[in-house]
From Swiss-Prot:
Membrane-topology annotation of the record: Peripheral membrane protein
Catalytic activity from the UniProt record: (5Z,8Z,11Z,14Z)-eicosatetraenoate + AH2 + 2 O2 = prostaglandin H2 + A + H2O; (9Z,12Z)-octadecadienoate + AH2 + O2 = (9R)-hydroxy-(10E,12Z)-octadecadienoate + A + H2O; (9Z,12Z)-octadecadienoate + AH2 + O2 = (9S)-hydroxy-(10E,12Z)-octadecadienoate + A + H2O; (9Z,12Z)-octadecadienoate + AH2 + O2 = (13S)-hydroxy-(9Z,11E)-octadecadienoate + A + H2O
Pathway where this protein functions: Lipid metabolism; prostaglandin biosynthesis
Induction text: By cytokines and mitogens.
Keywords assigned by UniProt, alphabetized: Dioxygenase, Disulfide bond, Endoplasmic reticulum, Fatty acid biosynthesis, Fatty acid metabolism, Glycoprotein, Heme, Iron, Lipid biosynthesis, Lipid metabolism, Membrane, Metal-binding, Microsome, Oxidoreductase, Peroxidase, Prostaglandin biosynthesis, Prostaglandin metabolism, Signal
Protein family per UniProt: Belongs to the prostaglandin G/H synthase family.
Residue span(s) of domain EGF-like: 18-55
Site (Aspirin-acetylated serine): S516
UniProt record, GO biological process: cyclooxygenase pathway; prostaglandin biosynthetic process; regulation of blood pressure; response to oxidative stress
Chain sites annotated for binding heme b: H374
EC number: 1.14.99.1
Stated name of the protein: Prostaglandin G/H synthase 2
Amino acid sequence: MLLPCALLAALLAAGHAANPCCSLPCQNRGVCMTTGFDRYECDCTRTGYYGENCTTPEFFTWLKLILKPTPNTVHYILTHFKGVWNIINNISFLRDTIMRYVLTSRSHLIDSPPTYNSDYSYKSWEAYSNLSYYTRSLPPVGHDCPTPMGVKGKKELPDSKLIVEKFLLRRKFIPDPQGTNVMFTFFAQHFTHQFFKTDHKKGPGFTKAYGHGVDLNHIYGETLERQLKLRLRKDGKLKYQMIDGEMYPPTVKDTQAEMIYPPHVPEHLQFSVGQEVFGLVPGLMMYATIWLREHNRVCDVLKQEHPEWDDEQLFQTTRLILIGETIKIVIEDYVQHLSGYHFKLKFDPELLFNQRFQYQNRIAAEFNTLYHWHPLLPDTFQIHNQEYTFQQFLYNNSIMLEHGLSHMVKSFSKQSAGRVAGGKNVPAAVQKVAKASIDQSRQMRYQSLNEYRKRFMLKPFKSFEELTGEKEMAAELEELYGDIDAMELYPGLLVEKPRPGAIFGETMVEIGAPFSLKGLMGNTICSPEYWKPSTFGGKVGFEIINTASLQKLICNNVKGCPFTAFHVLNPEPTEATINVSTSNTAMEDINPTLLLKEQSAEL
């Protein structure tokens, strides 16, 4: 009697094992909901589609699909016909109309309010209200699904170390054909680590950056306690020290604001700033120093305009101005460079005042993952007339004092960064960080690359060859994954065929741009109630934001106003390069991969 009962129980368990939503049947952003153990229902509400799996377009959806050009066609138009775009850029009405469309079409792809997180694959108050989570643009794959990608692919994913070594690890440095430089590389790291701050004690789905956007906590500290330690408490300024007549961050001893430094770093080189990991490399501390100087400079401007204001009002208003400067620089310099567009992007919050737009943001785990642009890093770092290896560069703030910011800016502006897409360009020094990106994606149960492409209105790849644009890697990937619909998001982004002459492939741009623009324009200062001169101390403060640029930031805060940009500048042929890789320094005994641990896993 026991045997038939056990058999029946096993059959029932087997019958209940596979969640019908594991096959991801609902298309076009339809929501899959189970109705019993073996049935599902697709909610097609407001998708523009109908039918059992939300696959039949409504009339206007069909018309839109017929008329809408592909993302690659749009990209081609925007990156060619320079003469036409020069005319459009000088006609305000046309430029504003196109910019408004760019902002709305991109940002409307982001769910706002947020919907899912790594623990909730369905809408819940917890997923909406708990700021300690990163949100998710697609729900995690169910624990009870037959394969890690739902029903597609093999039951076990290939070894992540093998994926890194076979497809991601650099053999020879591949420069970015778009001309991106190291100045851009460190700006990207510095800027994004105000909102990419994974709480590794809780898990990869959690964040310590509760502001979920551009709040400059990497300058001012994540908590009020840290902020107060960094503040001078006079004239709104941040604490600083003067070295050889120039302003630098204070030391940890001066602020008592803890930073992450190895024990060997001398006390006088333990600079203290808002983000505790920014002592990792001098490039990050360079930008931290520039923004420290900019904050204190703007405080002086406001103090002159408002001698009646106390320390708190000067500090808070300056912070809002620097948030505005940051967003302006990111859109008009940083995103402009990445896009490669001849169309001139514009930061103007008023473009959205008559649009359906929510002034809130929640950082997505997928956005954090795709931003792991380790291929940008060069093999060595060239500053003035010297060359530093990773070992010599890590936790070495003496480089900044030895060369000064002017030489660092000049040198980083001339040095080429690496191409991100196309595979095989992650430096060996950070291969463990790339492996961690894959492992954490698996822990959070990301859906496949193709599911993310569909989520962001892209056609899924039909083969590995279509993904990579070549045969060798494609064949090896097919052998390991078995099915293109089982290809993982992060490795897929890095091995994808780059667009012609570009740093990224199609997927990175079409997924990353919506997250980026929604996060920037969804900032509180861009809302109608905030975007007015009085918020920023009057016309003078408003003017600082509206005229901000990377070059102006450097000119106002770096001695000699060195010329800079986010693309490679022609080197001056008069300077010889000395390789210091054989010199005896305290940094030689450091293993860089040991230093790139949890606290810096996103750097």
